[in-house]
C-alpha cells in the first residue's frame, strides 16, 4: 500500500473539541450504539463551511446535551483552519437523543436550514439569515426512531421536500436484552425489532410540510433504514431514492411523478438488482453514497455493510440495472471483516476520479469476547480509484485515518478553501476528528449553484466537466454517508488538465447551460 491523499490530523489545531454523548449503560439500550452524525455547511453565508455535530443522550435524560455548532474562522488557501463554538448564540443549543442531520434551503431565502433526526422526536431549525436559527414547527416532527435524511425536490416544483429515514420500532420499555453466549450482555441486532416506514414530507411552499408517504407509494414498514441517497437511476430526469436497510432488502424507489398530481414512487430494488448482495440475501447496510466510479457517466452506488459482509459497489448499467461488483472492483475482500458506517465516494487526490472512504467501527464494545477476530475500534479504509473502469485499490491512510476508530458519521467539505476535500468524522461516545487533506497542488473547479426555477440549494444539479480526452460527471445530492451531510457544493479535481474545455450543466428544472472555458482554481457561483 502507498498513501493516497495525505490526510493529517487537524483536530487539535482546528479548535473542534466535540465528544459524542452516547448515554451508554450496562443495560445496553440499542439507541446508545447507533449515533451520531455531522453536517458541513455554511450557516452564516460568509463563504466558509462550518461544522455541526449531532449529539446523543442517555435514555430518559431530562436535560440532554445539545449538538454543537463550530464556526469556521477562516484560513483560506491551505492554511490551518480554526473554528469557534457558537452553539449558544446560534440558537442550536437544544438537546435530544439525536441521530442524523440534513441541510437545505427549504424556503429559498438564500440561507441553509437544518433538520436533525432523533429518537422520539425530530427538530427543524430555520435559518434566520443573521447567523442564528430558530426552532420551527413546520410539520417535520415524528416520534419514531430517526436515521439518515435527505432534502430532495421529488416533484421538481422548486421547493425541497424531505425524505426522513426511519429505523426500527423501539421504546425503552420494549428494548430487548441480548446475550449471544448466554453470559456477555450485548446490543441486539435489528432482527429482534419490527421495522418502521420511512417518511416523505412534501414542501408546501417553504413554511409547511405535509406527510405524503402513503399516497406517494413510499409506505414500507418492513424497511429498517439507516442510509439514503437521491440519484437519477433510470435517466429520466426525476430524482429516485436508493435506501440502505439493516438486515432487510435495500430499496430503490423510482420516481414516477408527472409534475401534476403529486409525488409518486415505485419500489424496484429486486427487479433492478439493488435489493440484495451476490448471495441473494439481505445484509446489514448502513452508509451509502453515489458516484460514477467506473467513468462511464452512470451513477454507481456504494453501500457500507456489517462485519463479515463485504461492502457493496452497485455498478449501474445503461439499462438502469445494478450489479454488486465490489469483489471485481477491488472493494469486496478488503471490506469483509470490518463494519462500515460512514461511506463517501469523493475524489481525495484531485485526479478526477472519485475514490471511496469507509469509516468503520463495531456496535459492541466487548465484541472481542464474542468474536476474537473482531474489534470495537476499527481502522478506516481508503480506496483509490485507478481510473478508466479499472477498479479500486486499498491504500494506506495517514493521520487519524490510520488509527482504529469507533466510526459513525462521515462528511466531506473544503474546510480550508484549497480545492481539495477534507473529512470530518464522528465516533460513538468518543471525540470527533478533523482530517485535513494535504494533497499536492492540482487544478480544480468548484461550483456553487443558485437555483431560480430549481430549488435554490441546487440539489439534483448534474454537471459534465469536459477536459481534453475525458469527461467528468458529478451530481449534487443530499443524504449520503451515514447520518451526515457533506458540504452542499461541488469540488472537482482536474488531474493533469490545466484547463476545462466546457462545463455542461443540467438543473433539476431541466434547464441546461453551457460555459465555455470556465475559470479554474476557484469556485464558480452559478445562477440558473
What is each of the regions a protein language model found here?
Residues 86-103, 117-154, 164-191, 195-197, ...:
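Asp-box/WD-like beta-propeller blade repeats and closely related beta-sheet repeat scaffolds
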Residues 16-37, 63, 90-102, 139-150, ...:
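Repeat-based blade/solenoid architectures
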Residues 3-6, 13-14, 24, 28, ...:
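Gly/Ser/Thr/Pro-enriched helix-cap/hinge segments flanking short amphipathic alpha-helices
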Residues 48-55, 109-118, 162-166, 239-245, ...:
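Hydrophobic beta-strand segments that make up the repeating blades of beta-propeller
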Residues 54-64, 166-193, 358-375:
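Short, conserved, GDST-rich strand-edge loop motifs in beta-rich repeat architectures
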Residues 7-9, 80-91, 132-140, 207-219, ...:
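Blade-edge beta-strand/turn elements of extracellular beta-propeller
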Residues 35-45, 71-72, 97-108, 112, ...:
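Beta-propeller blade termini
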Residues 68-72, 196-203, 254, 315, ...:
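Beta-propeller blade signature
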Amino acid at each position: 500500500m502507498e498513501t493516497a491523499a495525505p490526510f493529517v490530523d487537524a483536530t487539535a489545531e482546528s479548535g473542534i473539541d466535540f465528544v459524542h454523548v452516547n448515554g451508554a449503560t450496562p443495560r445496553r439500550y440499542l439507541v446508545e450504539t447507533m449515533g451520531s452524525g455531522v453536517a458541513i455547511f455554511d450557516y452564516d453565508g460568509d463563504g466558509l463551511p462550518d461544522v455541526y455535530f449531532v449529539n446523543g443522550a442517555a435514555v430518559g435524560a431530562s436535560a440532554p446535551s445539545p449538538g454543537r455548532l463550530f464556526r469556521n474562522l477562516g484560513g483560506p488557501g491551505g492554511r490551518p483552519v480554526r473554528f469557534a463554538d457558537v452553539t449558544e448564540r446560534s440558537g442550536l443549543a437544544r438537546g435530544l437523543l439525536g441521530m442524523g442531520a440534513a441541510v437545505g434551503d427549504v424556503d429559498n431565502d438564500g440561507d441553509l436550514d437544518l433538520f436533525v433526526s432523533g429518537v422520539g422526536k425530530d427538530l427543524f431549525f430555520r435559518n434566520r439569515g443573521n447567523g442564528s436559527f430558530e426552532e420551527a414547527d413546520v410539520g417535520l416532527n415524528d416520534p419514531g426512531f430517526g436515521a439518515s435524511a435527505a432534502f430532495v425536490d421529488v416533484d421538481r416544483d422548486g421547493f425541497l421536500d424531505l425524505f426522513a429515514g426511519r429505523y426500527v420500532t423501539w421504546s425503552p420499555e420494549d428494548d430487548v436484552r441480548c446475550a449471544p453466549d448466554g453470559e456477555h450482555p450485548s446490543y441486539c441486532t435489528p432482527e429482534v425489532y419490527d421495522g418502521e416506514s420511512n417518511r416523505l414530507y412534501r414542501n408546501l411552499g417553504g413554511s409547511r410540510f405535509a406527510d405524503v408517504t402513503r399516497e406517494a407509494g413510499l409506505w414500507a414498514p418492513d424497511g429498517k433504514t439507516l442510509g439514503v441517497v437521491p440519484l437519477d437511476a433510470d435517466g429520466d430526469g426525476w430524482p429516485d431514492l436508493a435506501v440502505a436497510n439493516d438486515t432487510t432488502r435495500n430499496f430503490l424507489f423510482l420516481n414516477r411523478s408527472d409534475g401534476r398530481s403529486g409525488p409518486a414512487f415505485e419500489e424496484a430494488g429486486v427487479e433492478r438488482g439493488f435489493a440484495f448482495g451476490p448471495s441473494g440475501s439481505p445484509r446489514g447496510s448502513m452508509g451509502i453514497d453515489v458516484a460514477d466510479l467506473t467513468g462511464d457517466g452512470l451513477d454507481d452506488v456504494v453501500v457500507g455493510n456489517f462485519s463479515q459482509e463485504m461492502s457493496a459497489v452497485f455498478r449501474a448499467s445503461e439499462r438502469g440495472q445494478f450489479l454488486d461488483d465490489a469483489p471485481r472492483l477491488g472493494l469486496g475482500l478488503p471490506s469483509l471483516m470490518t463494519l462500515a458506517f460512514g461511506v463517501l465516494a469523493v475524489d481525495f487526490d484531485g485526479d478526477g476520479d472519485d475514490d471511496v472512504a469507509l469509516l468503520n467501527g463495531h456496535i459492541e464494545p466487548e465484541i472481542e469476547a464474542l468474536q476474537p477476530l473482531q474489534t470495537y475500534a476499527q481502522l478506516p479504509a481508503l480506496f483509490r480509484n485507478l481510473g478508466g473502469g479499472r477498479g479500486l485499490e486499498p491504500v494506506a491512510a495517514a493521520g487519524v485515518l490510520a488509527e482504529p476508530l469507533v466510526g459513525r458519521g462521515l462528511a466531506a467539505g473544503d474546510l480550508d478553501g484549497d480545492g481539495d476535500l477534507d473529512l470530518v468524522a464522528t465516533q460513538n461516545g468518543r471525540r470527533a476528528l478533523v482530517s485535513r487533506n494535504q494533497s499536492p497542488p492540482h487544478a480544480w473547479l468548484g461550483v456553487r449553484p443558485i437555483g431560480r426555477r430549481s430549488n435554490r440549494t441546487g440539489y439534483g444539479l448534474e454537471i459534465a466537466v469536459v477536459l481534453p480526452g475525458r469527461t467528468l460527471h458529478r451530481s449534487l445530492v443530499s443524504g449520503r454517508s451515514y447520518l451526515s451531510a457533506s458540504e452542499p457544493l461541488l469540488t472537482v479535481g482536474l488531474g493533469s488538465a490545466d484547463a476545462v474545455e466546457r462545463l455542461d450543466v443540467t438543473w433539476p428544472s431541466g434547464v441546461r447551460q453551457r460555459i465555455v472555458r470556465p475559470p479554474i482554481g476557484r469556485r464558480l457561483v452559478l445562477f440558473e
